[in-house]
Swiss-Prot record:
The lineage of its organism: Bacteria, Bacillati, Actinomycetota, Actinomycetes, Micrococcales. GO terms for biological process: protein transport by the Tat complex. It is found in: Cell membrane. One of its GO terms (molecular function) is protein transmembrane transporter activity. The gene is tatA. The chain crosses the membrane at residues 1-21. This is Sec-independent protein translocase protein TatA. Residues 75-93 have a biased composition (Basic and acidic residues). Disulfide bonds: none annotated.
Length: 93
């Protein structure tokens, strides 16, 4: 496929971004983009660690994750209340 963007393409894209957002907003925009990339990278690494631990490999700190069967299931009060109200509604029909 070759090189899709040449230097001129990137220059035009940069010029359009400056015209759309203005020079006063660019620092805020770039900070937001960098922060979003950091969050994405952190989430991706956490997901990779979970996948590795499920395959029997330790995460980045050398710890193995607990299997889903060893983690107890705890119902919240809201779930119990909601289930009770749904059951009552069905009985009243």
């Amino acid at each position: 496929m070759g090189n899709v963007f040449s230097g001129w393409h990137l220059l035009v894209i940069l010029l359009v971004i400056v015209l759309l957002f203005g020079t006063s907003r660019l620092p805020k925009l770039s900070k937001s983009v960098v922060e979003a990339l950091k969050i994405f990278r952190r989430s991706f690494n956490e997901a990779s660690d979970i996948t590795r631990s499920q395959d029997g490999h330790p995460d980045s700190q050398g710890n193995f994750a607990e299997s889903a069967s060893s983690v107890p299931f705890v119902k919240s009060e809201k779930q119990s209340e909601k289930r009770a109200s749904v059951t009552e509604a069905k009985k009243s029909k």
